[in-house]
Amino acid sequence: MSKSKVLLVGAAGETGGSIVNGLLDDGNFDVIALIRPGSIQKTSITRLVDKGIQIRKCDLKASEEHLIEALADIDVIISCVGPAEQQDQIPLAKAAKKTGVKRFVPCGFITICPPGGIMWLRDEKEIVYNQIRQLWLPYTIVDVGWWYQLAYPRLESGCIDYAMTSGNDEIVGDGNMPTALTDLRDIGRYMARIISDPRTLNKKVLAYNLVSTQNKIHELMEELSEEKIVRNYVPEETICSRMVAARQASETYPFDPRKFIPRYMAEYQFSCGIRGDNNPEYAKYLGYHTTQDLYPDFKPTDFREYLESVIRGTAVGIYQDRIISRKHQRHFPRTGSSDSLYTRIFPRTESSDSLMSR
């Protein structure tokens, strides 16, 4: 039986990297990465080649003719583009329709949230989803909740700074809002099942490992680390004020993706921490299938064990090429072990490609 040919857009990003690993480990897929011609020499692309990933050179902004050529003999497309590039997927979807792609997985991979003005990023994605449906292109939309890797607070000792992307020192509202969590590394394992499953064709799927709250996560971190964590509760009024200010600051011309980062943060906090959107029960209400219902035999990474690895110093940090902006540095007490924390968050390059890659 021949393997399914999967074309991955954004294979060098965090989500894309997880999917690469999950598909390769499964063994039933030929994995091909669509790479911009100008990015071929990057170290991250060399690492893909070393894993045995085939490379096809094409830019999402290329002509339809070139996109169609790049999609020759592809069965499944999985897109992991950055927030600023969501609508660049539309020409790719049109080319996929013309080449007979059997399943298109657009770039979802965020928390649960209904469209219509709550999260700019959600609304950008929904524009793409609607275009796909208008094309009558077979699709699967996958969202993944909030990553383990972004869910835990900083410890005062600085011993886990090496693995952190930000201080994560705020508890939204009363801290008791349930939210779906997923280990980034499990996303690829879920995707190997989802794209092989006829039940998920033309459906929405929430892939998640467990449901927890910020308060419970703080308590667990205190138990495991034997350190006291100061609770910094941020009321709904403050979150809403930030969101309004961030929206006003971001709505400028020309489009500047850097101005949207405070907006993403505020809107995520509002949706997940105040509204409680990122909940499997709400996802089902919105029409999602869940991986816990679809794949009851799936063994997810245990959250407690993951946090133990973070505290031991054996976890792997994410967004290793990012640096924290000067604006955000003041939120991090500088200790001997936290200097490396300043190498996270925003990219060293000013290009929107690296800034917004997922």
Enumerate the predicted regions with their spans:
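Short, amphipathic alpha-helical "lid/cap" segments that border enzyme active or binding sites
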Residues: 68, 184-192, 300-308
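Oxidoreductase cofactor-interface core, primarily capturing Rossmann-like NAD(P)-dependent enzymes
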Residues: 2-46, 61-64, 84-87, 99, ...
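A hydrophobic C-terminal alpha-helical subdomain
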Residues: 238-328, 332, 337, 346, ...
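Short glycine-/small-residue-rich Rossmann-like dinucleotide-binding loops
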Residues: 82-83, 311
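Eukaryotic N-terminal targeting leaders
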Residues: 1-29, 38-52, 64-65, 97, ...
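N-terminal Rossmann-like NAD(P) cofactor-binding module of classical short-chain dehydrogenase/reductase
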Residues: 71, 75-79, 105
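Conserved Rossmann-fold cofactor-binding substructure of NAD(P)-dependent oxidoreductases
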Residues: 53-74
